[in-house]
A protein has these predicted regions:
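Terminal alpha-helical anchor/extension segments at protein ends
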Residues: 1-145
């Protein structure tokens, strides 16, 4: 199966648009990072509060990227875009997983609606309409010679 994936992400949310067999699908993954930061606690005796909070932050972020990778692992081509550093952090996680060669592009993008994200992915990986007869031989009604 030839699955192509485009995804917009920041540290709070990832919108994954996948195209396989000319069918498009969408999945949203959230990190719950805002909730995590607001309500994380530090237990006395575990070390400095800043170090513990930082370690927990990076562990939580790593789990978020692992969830994303689980949904895009079988893609043959991956387009990554979004604001900030999250796209580069995900790229490093993909490198560690041995998926670097599947990355088609890593691009900057501002906040986008789900429709804008889907449109951008469709432009990068066009879906061939089932009514597109351009691949058929015009002299034969069945497309075969």
């Amino acid at each position: 199966m030839n699955k192509k994936v485009g995804l917009w992400l920041d540290r709070n949310k990832a919108v994954i648009v996948s195209i396989a067999n000319n069918v498009e699908g969408k999945r949203i993954i959230t990190s719950d990072m805002e909730h995590y930061i607001l309500y994380s606690t530090v237990v006395p005796g575990d070390g400095s509060p800043e170090n513990i909070r930082d370690r927990r932050f990076w562990n939580h972020l790593g789990e978020y990227y692992d969830k994303i990778i689980a949904h895009i692992r079988d893609a043959t081509e991956i387009q990554i875009f979004g604001p900030g550093v999250a796209k580069h952090e995900l790229q490093k996680h993909l490198e560690r997983e041995g998926l670097m060669e599947r990355i088609d592009s890593v691009e900057d993008a501002d906040k986008m609606t789900d429709l804008q994200i889907a449109t951008r992915v469709q432009k990068r990986f066009p879906i061939r309409s089932r009514f597109d007869l351009s691949g058929m031989n015009a002299s034969s009604p069945t497309g075969r010679e």
